[in-house]
């Protein structure tokens, strides 16, 4: 896998959002966590831009850790790479003896490497085994989900995780076909979806298989349930003044991040209190007005940036003692 194809999304804006926390004189040796290391583009930029920072980088994909390890080797012991899912952040920090961090970055979704490696089965544009596991050493692949889940559960997944309006129609075709022969490769599924959808549904929203593949990937990797735990855990790990930046790539992820940040930025005091006790005051300050989008120029140069949505927040209050 050539690293030249890996272009970090909204890189400068992510660095700008995190910079005040990583250049704070109160923390001369700040700790920043890249929860989604991938090929290490954001991590490398963090290490280069903030020369006194220590980086903790997580990924569940062992191949990503190997490739990034080579890329980040020049930074020596400033970079600590950990094989972990990002909701394991509290355990990782505890193991490393790090009580609080100054910055956290999430770049959600599928890495360039996973999309570009045909045999991983993430991309619907090329035929490959239906796997889609980010950590190939554990769990159930996409083919097993398609071949074994009850029809009602498949419909739920396509609707909830793919926002697929034609879920019932697609699942009926899947069930009919899997009884003849179990699914193993992506091309057969793409063809089935194309045949199952009405003509009008094929005219909008790019490749007709896109939503189904997204739904299967989220189910296989437990992405939303992991994210539901990971974002609050990351906020908890932040020191006062620490900052978090999250890049998401579909509305389900972005909505979840939005809800966590909004809840953290809310005043939770009962109405009518003349003075608001500290425990009711906001823990977070939102740093972005809604979700920020990539520039037209960036999308023109890197089409994978097109669906990106960036949100940032700052920790402004410590935990109650």
UniProtKB/Swiss-Prot annotation:
Transmembrane segment boundaries: none
GO terms for MF: rRNA (cytosine-N4-)-methyltransferase activity
GO biological process, alphabetically ordered: rRNA base methylation
Enzyme Commission no: 2.1.1.199
Region (Disordered): 292-321
Reactions that this protein is recorded to catalyse: cytidine(1402) in 16S rRNA + S-adenosyl-L-methionine = N(4)-methylcytidine(1402) in 16S rRNA + S-adenosyl-L-homocysteine + H(+)
Residue sites binding S-adenosyl-L-methionine per the record: 40-42, 59, 93, 107, 114
Location relative to the cell: Cytoplasm
UniProt-listed InterPro entries: RsmH, SAM-dep_MeTrfase_MraW_recog, SAM-dependent_MTases_sf
GO cellular component, one term: cytoplasm
Key word Transmembrane present: no
Main location class: cytoplasm
Keywords: Cytoplasm, Methyltransferase, rRNA processing, S-adenosyl-L-methionine, Transferase
Family: Belongs to the methyltransferase superfamily. RsmH family.
Described function: Specifically methylates the N4 position of cytidine in position 1402 (C1402) of 16S rRNA.
Matches recorded under NCBIfam families: 16S rRNA (cytosine(1402)-N(4))-methyltransferase RsmH
Listed name of the protein: Ribosomal RNA small subunit methyltransferase H
Source organism phylogeny: Bacteria, Bacillati, Actinomycetota, Actinomycetes, Kitasatosporales
